Amino acid sequence: MRTHYCTDVTEKLIGQTVTVAGWVNSRRDHGGIIFIDLRDKSGLVQLVADPQDCKDALAIAETVRDEFVLIATGKVRARGEGLENPNLITGKIEIILENLVIENRSRPMPFDINDEKVNDEIKLRNRFLELRSKKSFDIFQLRSKATIQARNTLDELGFLDVETPILTKSTPEGARDYLVPSRVHAGEFYALPQSPQLFKQLLMVAGFDKYFQIAKCFRDEDLRADRQPEFTQIDVEMSFCNQEDVIKVAEKLIYDIFTKCGKNVPSTFRRMKYSEAMEKYGSDKPDLRFDMPLVDVIDIFANSTNEIFAEIAKDKKNNRIKALKCKNGDNIFSKRQMKSFEDYVRKFGAKGLGYFQMKEDGLKGPLTKFFSEADLEEIIKVTELEVGDVVFFGAGAKKVVWDYMGRFRLFLANEMNIVPKDAYEFLWVIDFPMFEVEDGRTKALHHPFTMPNVEKYDLDNIEDLEEIESIAYDIVLNGTELGGGSIRIHKEEIQSKVFKLMGISQEEAKEKFGFLLDALSYGAPSHGGFALGLDRMIMLLAGTDSIRDVIAFPKTQKAQCLLTQAPSAVDEEQLKELSIRIRKTVVDS
């Protein structure tokens, strides 16, 4: 039927007869001669319906409209002088129609597929039409290339591709599970996996040594621009390894994928301890495409006559006072703008935001009256201020200060337009805390199967659980967490201790994780691994701001598929088979 894709038709084929197929991108009638731009996945080619060559083809071309599906046969000829289109691969030739078939017609389009300003809801309701755009096809071609390279690299390194179950057991991994009711076991539920974590560990216990999977994962969590309820990750696990071994594999994999996709990236990445990332950048996923570190000034502010600062500075363990220098900020932002920045940080828990302006005769601003000349000079010194700079200050509980000052750092950089768009800055964040305590509850920062640094910490004799470090690592790219992993617990007694420290009783541990504890008692090897978020990786490679652009049929931020109207109600008979009854809540008006 088809002999060539549209962009395969070049000057080399002049004089030959070809058959192409695709969609009408545009149609133009020039005084009895009709020009059609035909589009397929490769691009565009111009068709010409001329009555001197084929009246039948012209008659059909007169009825053609945008997005009709055509099969066209004709002879390739060079375009006339001055008629070439340098913006097209096929811009030097055209196809003179000898036969034209309308394979299918199209209703008028609800939107222009190349108009990026179209309402998201309209595009998602007609996602199959949006996917016709060149931008969409290029993204999925990139995704396919990256996925194939991932498989090839891991295969070359001796990893075995193994599929793990989709219907599994509900276990606490942080987010809520998607539950699937069982018809056979009334009142019981499967859970869709948040990750293949436990199964890949069991494969290491089984002796598979090296495993990988392009895995579908599901999490019922609040959505944002870089999250979806179902997502894909490149999942990797290996036996008899340490952190260095795992990082080498991950760097090789990332390097190969990015190189295959035409990006120039280093083969090894810099590293930073979690504590340094939080103190210097207020984030465990810092964007290092620009500098602007946070500077600790709590000792200087301890001397302040401002009672609030002085009180905060008394507790250096739990509080922070951070300075953020804005280069040439005094010439970029007005006083009104600088005052408005306080509204921004208040959204993230800040109680205020102070600032100094560096003038020719020293620091100026409403806070200077609370400091001695010596302390003001010290602020200039530690923040390396020059005339025209502005320095902002955040003070309070350390986690709150880290969060809002880290966000403010990114906000300022974008306001100043100093973030290079075409740079790729990778970073390993290492030595994460094993636990975090919130509202009196102890949670694993990564997951409870991560190996704590037992060589450095005695789990039986520790007062502050948040001091315990784990052998965990995240890979960050341009301020986005691309993935992460850890060395796993491979001894049953350590896993039981971790559960106990988290407040999980022996009975609960046995009920939820008995299969894992059993497996660890049968000679489990040391093992570790990582997972890379494929969707996020493609989002960064493609330079798009939304993860929805890189998923063929994505959900909205309300976890709905507008195309298929999922989730949807099911009939009573189906519910009855599943022993489920929907309880309707009546709200009094």
From Swiss-Prot:
UniProt site positions, description: Important for tRNA non-discrimination: H30, G82
UniProt keyword list: Aminoacyl-tRNA synthetase, ATP-binding, Cytoplasm, Ligase, Nucleotide-binding, Protein biosynthesis
Main location per the UniProt record: cytoplasm
Tagged with keyword Nucleotide-binding: yes
Matching HAMAP family: Asp_tRNA_synth_type1
Residues given in the record as ATP binding sites: R219, D220, E221, Q228, E481, G533, L534, D535, R536
GO terms under biological process: aspartyl-tRNA aminoacylation
Function recorded in the entry: Aspartyl-tRNA synthetase with relaxed tRNA specificity since it is able to aspartylate not only its cognate tRNA(Asp) but also tRNA(Asn). Reaction proceeds in two steps: L-aspartate is first activated by ATP to form Asp-AMP and then transferred to the acceptor end of tRNA(Asp/Asn).
Alphabetized GO MF terms: aspartate-tRNA ligase activity; aspartate-tRNA(Asn) ligase activity; ATP binding; nucleic acid binding
Pfam families in the record: GAD, tRNA-synt_2, tRNA_anti-codon
EC number, as in UniProt: 6.1.1.23
Highest taxon of source: Bacteria
The family this protein is said to belong to: Belongs to the class-II aminoacyl-tRNA synthetase family. Type 1 subfamily.
InterPro entries: Aa-tRNA-synt_II, aa-tRNA-synth_II, aa-tRNA-synth_II/BPL/LPL, Asp-tRNA-ligase_1, Asp-tRNA-ligase_1_N, Asp/Asn-tRNA-synth_IIb, AspRS_core, GAD-like_sf
Protein name according to UniProt: Aspartate--tRNA(Asp/Asn) ligase
Subunit and partners: Homodimer.
Organism of provenance: Aliarcobacter butzleri (strain RM4018) (Arcobacter butzleri)
Keyword Aminoacyl-tRNA synthetase: yes
Cell compartments where the protein resides: Cytoplasm
Residue ranges, annotated region (Aspartate): 197-200
CDD domains reported in the protein's UniProt record: AspRS_core (cd00777), EcAspRS_like_N (cd04317)
Residues engaged in binding L-aspartate: E173, R219, H446, R488
EC top class, as a word: ligase
Gene name as annotated: aspS
